[in-house]
């Protein structure tokens, strides 16, 4: 994407995958953003360099994302910003802070509320701040977002839980110490057992 982060909805037919495998060959995108199979299309709904609903810049270094149904015919897309202090020196906007875990850390998460019919952004906002290097994450069966710091410096290297429907609350700034402090790559919750599976960066 030419070094720019973007959040996009990929839209396709509701048919089953062909038993011959896959959805077909990728078709080159004239816009140079993403190549998709026939009958698929995308729409960029948010992009680094644009502005949040608050007027602050959309932070960069987008990483893990998840979408969940919400009220009033909308979907909430939560995204990580895998930022560290050196990124802000090179021009990346930090995540705006209200109740940060660490005021010196530029990372965090934002959420985008999308209209299901028009597939357009209604608003976007910060859901957590003051973290380092958020990598992959997990949408939980109970509707929150577990997000992982791929970092191991003083006071960092934790998993945090974010509620996109109650942004920047105390939960979002409280590390889940029971999941350890190390360079977390990802977390996944088994919906049947409730067990959490953690991966780490070697």
Where are these regions (language model features)?
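N-terminal pre-domain segments of enzymes
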Residues: 19-33
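N-terminal export signals
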Residues: 1-18
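Extended, regular secondary-structure scaffolds
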Residues: 159-161, 185-186, 190-202
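Blade-edge beta-strand/turn elements of extracellular beta-propeller
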Residues: 29-50, 55-56, 114-128, 160-183
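Beta-rich, blade/repeat-based domains predominating
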Residues: 56-68, 130-142, 181-194
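N-terminal low-complexity or amphipathic/hydrophobic leaders
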Residues: 44-88
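Conserved beta-propeller blade signature
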Residues: 76-78, 145-146, 194-199
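Well-ordered mid-protein domain cores that form the structural environment of catalytic cofactors
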Residues: 83-173
């Amino acid at each position: 994407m030419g070094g720019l982060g973007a959040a996009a909805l990929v839209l396709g037919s509701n048919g089953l995958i062909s038993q011959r495998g896959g959805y077909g060959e990728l078709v080159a995108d004239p816009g140079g953003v993403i190549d998709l199979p026939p009958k698929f299309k995308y729409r960029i709904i948010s992009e680094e360099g644009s502005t949040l609903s608050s007027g602050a810049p959309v932070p960069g270094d987008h990483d893990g994302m998840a979408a969940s149904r919400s009220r009033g015919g909308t979907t909430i897309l939560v995204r990580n910003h895998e930022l560290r202090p050196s990124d802000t020196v090179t021009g990346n906007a930090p995540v705006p802070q209200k109740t940060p875990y660490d005021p010196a850390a530029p990372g965090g998460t934002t959420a985008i509320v999308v209209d299901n019919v028009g597939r357009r952004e209604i608003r976007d906002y910060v859901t957590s701040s003051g973290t380092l290097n958020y990598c992959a994450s997990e949408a939980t069966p109970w509707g929150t977002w577990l997000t992982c710091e791929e970092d191991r410096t003083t006071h960092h290297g934790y998993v945090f839980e974010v509620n996109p429907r109650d942004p920047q609350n105390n939960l979002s700034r409280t590390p889940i110490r029971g999941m350890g402090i190390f360079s977390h790559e990802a977390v996944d919750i088994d919906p049947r057992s409730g067990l959490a599976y953690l991966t780490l960066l070697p």
